[in-house]
Every structure is written in structure tokens, then in C-alpha cells.
Amino acid sequence: MLYPTPIAKLIESFTKLPGIGIKTATRLAFYTIGMSDEDVNNFAKNLLAAKRELTYCSVCGNLTDDDPCNICTDESRDRSTVLVVEDSKDVSAMEKIQEYHGLYHVLHGLISPMNGIGPDDINLKSLLTRLRDNSDIHEVIIATNATADGEATAMYISRVLKPAGITVTRLARGLAVGSDIEYADEVTLLRAIENRTEL
């Protein structure tokens, strides 16, 4: 069906979001049009504020509105351990279990030879620099997803860090192969941390 241009543009904008197909985008567009002006203005204001005010922590790469982020500046955290994750959503998932008290490093992606993504295309150099410049870090826990790309990334990091004498561990296999950390329940994540294995 042909919609007026403003609706068609709104539908097109919604389809750019991950997991949103044309039907859902159409439903969201019509719902948005039915919202009050105040709600639409607040939605737009919050969307712009999130885009403009958030940045990546210069230490760990996590999304933050302060740089460095509140995790990196929290003196009560265990500074001997760094948990390496794919993206900021994984940091949130791990923080929910309230059992990990170390630091994080966000890669912003995974090594994916099939997609032409190599080690230089993710936030890996800053991890290596961070480890080189900080002798307090003794263990790196790799918490990438249990996918082919997650495994490739974990193995690469392990190979690079082993000569430096840093203990490199991997989350235990409470996580199903192909599963995403952000969707795992808290008990599964807790068991995966507790039973991590050395690489």
C-alpha cells in the first residue's frame, strides 16, 4: 500500500533498526503518529540526547556519559581482572548478576574472517596497550559469544596474550553454542564465570 510521504519515511527509518521488518515498522510508525505531541517530542529529545551525550570510555570502550566510565573509576573494583566482551550490552548483562567485580574491555565487534573483519577492525589494540601499561592486571576473562566468530576472537586474544604471562580464561560452557551473552539468564552467567577455563 502506498502511504503519504511522511509515514513512508518514518516506516523506512524504523526498518533500519535491527530485527524490525516492514510490518513491525509500519505498526510502530502508526503508533507513533497516534501518540501525543508531548510524547513524540520527549521520544525525539531522548533519542537525540542518547546519540549526542553518550561516548565510549577511553579506558574500556563501554558506553558512558562520563569519561572514563563509572566502572573504570570505581576504586572498589578488582583491578587484577579484565572481562573482555563484544559490546556494551554484554557489560550490562554481566553487571546484572552482581558477582563479577573486576574491570571490562569492550571490543565493539568480533574477528570475522568470513566478513573481512580482522583484529585491527575491533577495539583490540587498546586492550593490548592497557595490559602492557598496567601491571596490576593478571587475568583476562574472555566472554565473547559462543559462535564461530566469538571462538575465533577468543583464540586470537589467547594467542596474543599468552607470551605476556597473563592468565587467559574463557567463560564456561553453561552458554549454549551460538547463544548471545546479553540474552543469557543470570544463573547461567554466574555459573559461566565461576567455572571459567584457562585457554
Swiss-Prot record:
Keyword Ubl conjugation: no
Keywords, sorted A to Z: DNA damage, DNA recombination, DNA repair, Metal-binding, Zinc, Zinc-finger
Swiss-Prot/TrEMBL GO biological process terms: DNA recombination; DNA repair
Entry-linked Gene3D superfamilies: 3.30.60.80, 3.40.1360.10, 6.10.250.240, RecR Domain 1
InterPro entries: DNA_Rcmb_RecR, Rcmb_RecR, Rcmb_RecR_Znf, TOPRIM_dom, TOPRIM_RecR
GO molecular-function terms, A-Z: DNA binding; zinc ion binding
Disulfide bridge partners, by residue number: none
CDD domains on file: TOPRIM_recR
Residue ranges annotated for the Toprim domain, each copy included: 80-176
Zn finger spans (C4-type): 57-72
Role according to the record: May play a role in DNA repair. It seems to be involved in an RecBC-independent recombinational process of DNA repair. It may act with RecF and RecO.
PANTHER family per record: RECOMBINATION PROTEIN RECR
Membership in a protein family: Belongs to the RecR family.
Protein name as annotated: Recombination protein RecR
Native source species: Streptococcus mutans serotype c (strain ATCC 700610 / UA159)
